[in-house]
Curated annotation (Swiss-Prot):
GO MF annotation list: GTP binding; GTP cyclohydrolase I activity; zinc ion binding
Native source organism of the sequence: Mucuna pruriens var. utilis
PROSITE patterns: GTP_CYCLOHYDROL_1_2 (PS00860)
Protein name: GTP cyclohydrolase 1
Regulation: GTP shows a positive allosteric effect, and tetrahydrobiopterin inhibits the enzyme activity.
Reaction(s) catalysed by this chain's protein: GTP + H2O = 7,8-dihydroneopterin 3'-triphosphate + formate + H(+)
Subunit text: Toroid-shaped homodecamer, composed of two pentamers of five dimers.
Length: 80
């Protein structure tokens, strides 16, 4: 989960990360670490996706990176 910077409420979900390697390949645990590192910060879902993609691209030199985050935002769930 991560915390919304606007409402200070959590959003909970899954991150799907895919990339086209350019020589260097990350293990699954490294991808999970990158996601966890950025998810611990106050932010919005769009920034989280961008930060994960940029980090994977920087570390691997990937030809392309895709990040999709499916999340439930507690600010929306609590409103009904």
């Amino acid at each position: 989960f991560s915390m919304c910077e606007h409402h200070l409420l959590p959003f909970i979900g899954k991150a799907h990360v895919a990339y086209i390697p350019n020589g260097k390949v990350l293990g699954l645990s490294k991808v999970a670490r990158i996601v966890d590192m950025y998810a611990r910060r106050l932010q919005i879902q769009e920034n989280l996706s961008r930060q994960i993609a940029e980090a994977v691209e920087q570390v691997t030199g990937a030809l392309g990176v895709a990040v999709v985050i499916e999340a439930q935002h507690m600010c929306m769930v609590m409103r009904g």
